């Protein structure tokens, strides 16, 4: 029996990058995936799309459905979650992955850019989390994984708005976990390592040679699967680094899925 058999998992921002890798990894463990994103092959002819992620999951026998969702608009979020519940059932696991990054210092950050980053990285998490909490509270079970970033605590002079949004996300994680302790819902932040995504590799191939610290998208999968598969709230309200998975936080008895 796979670790996530019978689970319905929603991953936002899953048409590409880390979100896509997480979705495929969850599907390999038996979960039914709702792929949420804004990049559709109908509007963007590129190969990185909701439809492609869904097809790649189905190609290895997994279960997945795709839904257009702009996490910055509550009406779009509510519509996507209404549709996915009708097709896949109640949500067991929510992975808030959708996010935007701008490498701009504070002095160069316009009001519109600030609003755009906060709207996606914080408001989007609020909208999607609110969309699942009622059913999770009724069932007294559920898992919420917020994909964060160590940039929230770095001294990098750039990406100020992004750093603020991710630090805020981690604080939201801690407060929400405390509020939901009596409902059997775990809420954790997970920080990936410095990740070379598929899109970045295509646009900036020279970046791979500039730093030895790049990690692959798929490296976050074991940590995500472990968090999604845990029962109850033994681990909740934590800001976790996926690079420490297996050393400073537990994986006993958990084997790692492989993904191409």
PLM-predicted stretches and their roles:
Residues 2-88, 102, 257-258:
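Short-chain dehydrogenase/reductase
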Residues 105-106, 113-115:
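Substrate-binding pocket helix/loop in short-chain dehydrogenase/reductase
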Residues 129, 165:
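Active-site helix of classical SDR
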Residues 109, 155-163, 175, 203:
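Active-site loop-to-helix junction immediately N-terminal to the catalytic Tyr of the SDR YXXXK motif
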């Amino acid at each position: 029996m796979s670790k996530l058999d019978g689970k319905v998992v929603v991953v936002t921002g899953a048409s590409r990058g880390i979100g896509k890798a997480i979705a495929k990894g969850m599907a390999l463990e038996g979960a039914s995936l709702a792929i949420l994103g804004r990049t559709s092959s109908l509007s963007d002819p590129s190969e990185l799309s909701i439809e492609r992620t869904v097809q790649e999951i189905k190609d290895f026998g997994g279960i997945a459905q795709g839904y257009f969702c702009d996490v910055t608009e509550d009406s779009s979020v509510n519509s996507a979650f209404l549709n996915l519940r009708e097709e896949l059932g109640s949500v067991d696991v929510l992975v808030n992955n959708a996010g935007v990054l701008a490498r701009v210092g504070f002095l160069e950050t316009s009001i519109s850019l600030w609003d755009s980053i906060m709207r996606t990285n914080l408001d989007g998490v609020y909208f999607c989390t609110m969309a699942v909490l009622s059913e999770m509270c009724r069932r007294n079970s559920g898992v919420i994984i917020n994909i964060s970033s160590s940039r929230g605590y770095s001294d990098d002079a750039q990406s100020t708005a992004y750093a603020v949004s991710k630090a805020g996300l981690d604080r939201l994680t801690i407060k929400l976990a405390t509020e939901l302790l009596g409902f059997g819902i775990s809420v954790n932040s997970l920080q990936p390592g410095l990740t070379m995504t598929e899109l970045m590799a295509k646009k900036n191939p020279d970046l791979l040679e500039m730093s030895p610290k790049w990690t692959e998208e798929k490296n976050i999968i074991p940590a995500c699967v472990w968090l999604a598969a845990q029962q109850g709230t033994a681990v909740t309200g934590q800001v976790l680094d996926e690079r420490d998975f297996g050393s400073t936080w537990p994986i006993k008895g958990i084997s790692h899925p492989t993904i191409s």
